[in-house]
Amino acid sequence: MTQFASPVLHTLLDTDAYKLHMQQAVFHHYYDVQVAAEFRCRGDDLLGIYADSIREQVDAMQHLALQDDEYQWLSGLPFFKADYLDWLRDFRFNPEQVTITNDNGKLNIRLAGPWREVIMWEVPLLAVISEIVHRYRSPEMGVEHALATLESKLGEFAQMTESVDMSRFRLMDFGTRRRFSREVQQAIVKRLQQEPWFVGTSNYDLARRRNLTPMGTQAHEWFQAHQQISPDLATSQRAALAAWLEEYPDQLGIALTDCITMDAFLRDFGPEFAQRYQGLRHDSGDPVEWGEKAIAHYKKLGIDPLTKVLVFSDNLDLSKALELYRHFSARVNLSFGIGTRLTCDIPQVKPLNIVIKLVECNGKPVAKLSDSPGKTICHDKAFVRALRKAFDLPQIKKAS
């Protein structure tokens, strides 16, 4: 390996919590389901030149395995069953599931294989891409620059919150996927642990080593896959919500609302789901409008919003989180997940706007429509039309 290509990843647990939570549900319910996922760069970065370095990292990932102390720690958490953890012990990344090409400067990546295995690629692979790119672009930058920026922002935040009751403010690190580096994320989390309102991280490795609560439930792919798993497209979102409760009847009960749109989600989120799920997560669209809709929905169902949690995780920074806290904190419980603005907030460093999203399940198309234009992902325009029709949405947005 070149000096720039020392391994980015050192443990299987250097991933987001929702990946393991979803993987266990897939292991128990959808063991044989096949999927395909694709990489997207939402910015104008030409990342194809890094294809060989990324390939090198992907090939090295086959050597990652769950260690005994990690297995013991996971066994002590309330989420996991023994059969899944025993299987996870034997899990190895299969680099043959990953196709990486440089298409005239554009980076193309496609993942394909059993869902129970492919599900594990997204977060560490995005972290690899982000770190490799930053190693080449900003080799002189690192932990001290990230911490200096954070200290400055925490100072401003302390001034902004002097006269605010912060007792109900909860903030989590959601920064694994687009971090500057593993070391930067670790340093940021360590510093944030000094703040009374910092409650956890989405990163399982950091949660274990820093004695933090691992945070995360499910992602868009859980709902997307059900578009083909469920026999009826119109009820696929309800099927996804029900299957999640089968796996986790009394915990991990935060539901992601924007795979189709918030309005379509709320039509499916009836009294039983609303009672049983602990809350909802916002990931696209106007956050204030979304929060007001959520609170109104709970009230309409006769549920006190103060018994529920709204999690905001879309493009947040500290000041945006504070704005939302001031707006909503008297009416509902709140948590804020901040990613890129914590773990890749360094002067002169441009964070990457990169994602990996499901595009097929069992050989058929799936889609994410979302509440933000430009976040729609699907190759098959006819399927997008069918999805919009099934969920009673106007035929306006084009698939990208």
From Swiss-Prot:
Coiled coil: none annotated. GO terms for molecular function: nicotinate phosphoribosyltransferase activity. GO terms for cellular component: cytosol. Transiently phosphorylated on a His residue during the reaction cycle. Phosphorylation strongly increases the affinity for substrates and increases the rate of nicotinate D-ribonucleotide production. Dephosphorylation regenerates the low-affinity form of the enzyme, leading to product release. Keywords: Ligase, Phosphoprotein, Pyridine nucleotide biosynthesis. Transmembrane segments: none annotated. The modification Phosphohistidine is found at H220. Pathway: Cofactor biosynthesis; NAD(+) biosynthesis; nicotinate D-ribonucleotide from nicotinate: step 1/1. The keyword Iron-sulfur does not apply. It catalyses: nicotinate + 5-phospho-alpha-D-ribose 1-diphosphate + ATP + H2O = nicotinate beta-D-ribonucleotide + ADP + phosphate + diphosphate. Gene3D superfamilies: nicotinate phosphoribosyltransferase. Its EC number is 6.3.4.21. Catalyzes the synthesis of beta-nicotinate D-ribonucleotide from nicotinate and 5-phospho-D-ribose 1-phosphate at the expense of ATP. Belongs to the NAPRTase family. This is Nicotinate phosphoribosyltransferase. It comes from Enterobacter sp. (strain 638). The gene is pncB.
